[in-house]
Amino acid sequence: MTDFDTLVRLLRRWTHNHDPHVRAAVELLIEHETWIRRAGFQRACIEKNAREVWINWRKAREFADSGAVASTSEMAVLDLAVALGEDRYKFSIMGPANSRMIAQAVARAPGEDR
């Protein structure tokens, strides 16, 4: 298992020149911490070679769908992060107007704006 701070640094290096949806997915996992710290997630979803570390989104989807033991909210965060990483909702091709509309809808979804 890789040290958390080292893994965060390596993942951020990987996403530095990556698509925004991948950076968003990785940052969500980093900020949440739960999955990045879990040895099972690291073994199943994080790949590395001599130069870099990355998240294999296909394996991360399989991991999430396999029934990993976690709270409902932890699973929801993982599911959202994987969906972002996979570009499931095609954010990478959204124009500015749709991007703003989607961001506003997501911001309102938890009911925090009341």
Kindly give the residue locations of the regions a language model identified.
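Extended, charge-biased low-complexity segments
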Residues: 1-70, 75, 85-114
